[in-house]
């Protein structure tokens, strides 16, 4: 059978329609499929003429409201985006040097932005009121935190063994031997370091404690007159002139999961009958060619499934500038002026229509709100580790989120997704310049969300958390190692952000946000240093004789003091600060009802399981975060890759590779302390034994089988599992459907398969006018690609081929018209397995099924060279 016949069999046509096509040669076939009868000078350009026909045969329902146009050279083009209306975006350069800022001030170059009030007198009075309340609350927080820290630090000083601080006189030590002086001072140097680190760490714990306590009281009372959600006045009509873009920046994500969540979200919006106010933009930065083709296929299928009326758009950037923030900047520059608001979605985000319409109404009701952040509930994962994290965020999260809102009010956090943003002020004030200088802390800002919130507030717009707004969801990493990969990026990003701490005009709250972001990771090396100094102090005590006389004529010796009962009391007080928020969280659930969490007994057992796992993993995270901080300062690059979105277990090999050094450290540490003083090992037991067990805990907690067993026993149950919202049920159903028809090896199918080639050709973006130089370059790319096996073709070459419609058309022609010449490509394609259901949307919809061949047979025939 010749290749033309195989090509015809691969087309989604009835048997009768196939019989009308000529099977003489590929060029004649494409000319027959060309309804416009374009006359192409080159024979290998003939597939360009049939692109429109192949698209209409393959995805007829998707093209009903999607315009097929022609570019300047008469080539078929599928409009994936609306017409751009460009806005001017110009980021202000950062002035992070306080000396430079002072010099600017002396010269009269004031860089502080000034904003004109947009509010009525009544609205100004309301804003002034909550600003005043917020300031008072924060002063109270500082007073409580510092007072508690000072008291605990003084108490810690009294229980340290060496109490001769006042007797140390450096002048008296000048005349004696240096080694003797050093050994006299060493215990006090170690104790001073311990005391300083204790004060910093206790202050960090204390701030979290008061935040959780205020959140508990707020949720227990149930009324918050400063809540942004309180401004909702029912289902008031949305202003038709204020349209909202739902934008989802993605990069090499799980295509099936992305489009399942998008479909569920959009159908939930349609259920509110408010879909006319929204558009969806899928903004791809993907650079894996197979994923790029899979995204195009998923997008065109989505159009048919939701009966799109020209409201769902897809774009893949050619130049990946500034990662996610650059992707959003590109959208704002080209299409931002068409919308009043935009909702930023992550690749794993799912939001209900009620939540989205409520966010829009909140923006309408609060004209000075620049960003309103919803609180995303974690759900959807099945590994034991992820289920513990889901349970923790669902149980403890409300307290800390409500507490953050209590202290921050309209000067709050933005987490980069599941939030609504007022587009115009974002364009004017929140475009991020590159950080000046060289090294790993310069260049593109990694953790852009905190910075954008700070700039929005600096411009006079409010940043709020709608902590009590339901219908916002996300997913968590499936295992510890995947979470730590994400933490490394966040660590680096937060350390970069701290360079902006002294930028002029920022609100003190957002300077504090930068500080807390750094402390989230810097606390790990500080804790490690605290433990190391404590161990060193124990070693000094064990191997050296105490210096009882610190001055030449001292009358009474200074005895080392050991007061274990006081140490236990301080430890207990610290544990109260650490664990009381968890107890308050479960107390709140006990008061409000435990049914959605599996009942009183099960939710209590679940809490104990989560506490045990968190205790076991805390030292592990400490060491990893310490390495992350050190590596960032040493200049080690961070690869910004998409996190694992599916349930994935850790292998034993990977666990021992990642945790082997921790296991060894735990063994050495425990052995050394047991040899020195068994009593000290008791204090370090939670640390060292957690390190020893780290590979085993990492593996077993990553297993979905363990998590599903806990789910069957109704342990670690969350309300989203007890009574799943429709939008999450739909997401799971659509994900299963997408998994069944997933497209692998997308690039090769884009070269060979008639339908996928037509799709990639029609959506390719490199549409240039005729040029002799360009033709030479195209021929060079094609010759270079076809003269080596496809598996040797690198990623950048594949992306270059995918972006040019002429190149994709000519590649398609070459492999079908000259299979013997390009046997390496044909043979490679024959070895690939095409999912039979991947072409489901390509099957035509007719009444007489007898006219169709079996789908599997069609796929087999589509493989060139199949006997």
Curated annotation (Swiss-Prot):
Family matches, as InterPro entries: Glucans_biosynth_gluTrFase_H, Glyco_trans_2-like, Glycosyltr_2/OpgH_subfam, Nucleotide-diphossugar_trans
Keywords, A to Z? Cell inner membrane, Cell membrane, Glycosyltransferase, Membrane, Transferase, Transmembrane, Transmembrane helix
Per its record, what are the GO molecular function terms?
A: hexosyltransferase activity
Q: How does it sit in the membrane?
A: Multi-pass membrane protein
TM stretches of this protein = 139-156, 194-216, 518-540, 568-590, 603-625, 680-702
Pathway the protein contributes to: Glycan metabolism; osmoregulated periplasmic glucan (OPG) biosynthesis
Query: Under which EC number(s) is this enzyme classified?
Result: 2.4.1.-
Cite the Gene3D superfamilies for this sequence: Spore Coat Polysaccharide Biosynthesis Protein SpsA, Chain A
* Stretch list, region Disordered: 71-91
* GO annotation terms (biological process): glucan biosynthetic process
- Enzyme class comes to transferase
Q: Where in the cell is it found?
A: Cell inner membrane
Record-stated family: Belongs to the glycosyltransferase 2 family. OpgH subfamily.
Q: What does this protein do?
A: Involved in the biosynthesis of osmoregulated periplasmic glucans (OPGs).
> What NCBIfam families does the entry give?
PRK05454.1-1 (NF003955), PRK05454.2-1 (NF003958), PRK05454.2-5 (NF003962)
Kindly provide the name given to this protein in its UniProt entry.
Answer: Glucans biosynthesis glucosyltransferase H
| Species name | Nitrosomonas europaea (strain ATCC 19718 / CIP 103999 / KCTC 2705 / NBRC 14298)
- Its encoding gene is what? opgH
């Amino acid at each position: 059978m010749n290749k033309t016949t195989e090509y015809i069999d691969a087309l989604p046509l009835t048997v009768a329609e196939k019989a009308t096509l000529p099977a003489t040669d590929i060029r004649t076939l494409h000319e027959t499929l060309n309804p416009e009868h374009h006359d192409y000078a080159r024979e290998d350009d003939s597939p360009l003429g049939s692109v429109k026909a192949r698209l209409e045969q393959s995805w007829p329902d998707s093209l009903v409201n999607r315009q097929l146009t022609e570019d300047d050279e008469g080539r078929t083009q599928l409009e994936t985006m609306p017409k751009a209306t460009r806005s001017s975006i110009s980021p202000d350069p950062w002035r992070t040097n306080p000396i430079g800022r002072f010099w600017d001030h002396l010269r009269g170059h004031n860089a502080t932005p000034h904003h004109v009030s947009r509010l009525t007198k009544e609205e100004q009075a309301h804003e002034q009121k909550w600003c005043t309340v917020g300031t008072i609350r924060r002063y109270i927080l500082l007073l409580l935190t510092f007072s508690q820290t000072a008291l605990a630090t003084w108490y810690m000083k009294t229980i340290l063994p060496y109490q001769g601080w006042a007797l140390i006189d450096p002048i008296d030590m000048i005349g004696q031997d240096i080694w003797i002086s050093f050994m006299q001072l060493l215990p006090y140097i170690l104790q001073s370091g311990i005391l300083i680190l204790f004060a910093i760490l206790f202050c960090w714990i204390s701030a979290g404690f008061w935040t959780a306590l205020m959140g508990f009281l707020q949720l227990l009372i149930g009324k918050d007159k400063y809540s942004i959600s309180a401004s909702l006045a029912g289902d008031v009509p949305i202003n038709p002139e204020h349209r909202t873009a739902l934008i989802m920046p993605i990069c090499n994500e799980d295509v099936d999961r992305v489009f399942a969540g998008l479909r569920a979200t959009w159908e939930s919006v349609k259920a509110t009958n408010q879909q006319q106010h929204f558009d969806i933009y899928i903004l791809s930065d993907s650079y894996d060619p197979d994923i790029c083709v899979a995204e195009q296929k998923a997008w065109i299928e989505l159009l048919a499934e939701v009966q799109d009326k020209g409201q769902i758009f897809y774009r893949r950037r050619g130049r990946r500038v500034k990662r996610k923030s650059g992707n959003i900047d590109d959208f704002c520059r080209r299409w931002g002026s068409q919308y009043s608001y935009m909702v930023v979605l992550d690749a794993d985000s799912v939001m209900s229509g009620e939540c989205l319409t409520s966010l829009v109404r909140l923006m309408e009701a609060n004209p000075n709100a620049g960003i309103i952040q919803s609180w995303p509930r974690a759900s959807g994962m099945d590994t034991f580790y992820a289920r513990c994290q889901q349970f923790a965020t669902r149980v403890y999260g409300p307290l800390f989120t409500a507490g953050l809102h209590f202290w921050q009010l309209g000067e709050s956090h933005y987490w980069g997704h599941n939030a609504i943003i007022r587009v115009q002020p974002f364009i004017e004030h929140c475009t991020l310049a590159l950080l000046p200088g060289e090294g790993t802390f310069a260049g593109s800002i990694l953790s852009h969300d905190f910075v954008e919130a700070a700039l929005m507030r600096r411009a006079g717009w409010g940043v709020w958390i709608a902590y009590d707004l339901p219908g916002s969801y996300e997913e968590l990493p499936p295992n510890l190692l995947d979470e730590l990969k994400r933490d490394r990026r966040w660590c680096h990003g937060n350390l970069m952000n701290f360079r902006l701490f002294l930028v002029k005009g920022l609100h003190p709250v957002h300077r504090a946000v930068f500080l807390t972001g750094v402390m989230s990771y810097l606390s790990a090396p500080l804790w490690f240093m605290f433990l190391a100094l404590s161990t060193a102090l124990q070693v000094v005590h064990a191997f050296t004789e105490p210096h009882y006389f610190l001055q030449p004529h001292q009358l009474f010796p200074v005895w080392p003091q050991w007061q274990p009962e006081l140490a236990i009391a301080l430890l207990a007080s610290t544990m109260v600060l650490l664990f009381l928020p968890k107890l308050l969280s479960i107390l709140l659930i006990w008061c409000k009802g435990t049914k959605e969490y599996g009942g009183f007994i099960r939710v209590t057992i679940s809490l104990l399981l989560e506490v045990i796992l968190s205790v076991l993993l805390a030292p592990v995270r400490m060491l990893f975060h310490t390495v992350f901080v050190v590596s960032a300062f040493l200049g080690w690059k961070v690869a910004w890759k998409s996190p694992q979105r599916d349930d994935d277990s850790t292998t034993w090999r990977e666990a021992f590779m990642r945790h082997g050094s921790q296991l060894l450290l735990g063994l050495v540490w425990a052995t050394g302390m047991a040899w020195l003083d068994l009593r000290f090992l008791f204090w370090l037991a939670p640390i060292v034994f957690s390190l020893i067990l780290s590979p085993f805990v990492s593996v077993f907690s990553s297993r979905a089988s363990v998590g599903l067993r806990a789910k069957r026993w109704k342990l670690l149950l969350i309300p989203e599992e007890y009574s799943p919202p429709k939008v999450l049920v739909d997401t799971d159903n659509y994900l299963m459907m997408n998994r069944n028809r997933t497209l692998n090896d997308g690039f090769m199918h884009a070269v060979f398969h008639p339908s996928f080639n037509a799709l990639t050709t029609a959506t390719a973006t490199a549409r240039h006018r005729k040029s002799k130089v360009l033709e030479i370059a195209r021929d060079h790319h094609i010759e270079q690609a076809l003269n080596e096996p496809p598996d040797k073709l690198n990623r950048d070459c594949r992306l270059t081929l995918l972006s040019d419609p002429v190149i994709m058309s000519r590649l398609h022609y070459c492999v079908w018209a000259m299979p013997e010449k390009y046997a390496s490509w044909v043979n490679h394609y024959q070895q690939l397995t095409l999912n039979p259901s991947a072409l489901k949307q390509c099957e035509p919809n007719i009444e007489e099924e007898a006219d169709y061949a079996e789908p599997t047979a069609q796929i087999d025939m589509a493989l060139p060279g199949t006997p």
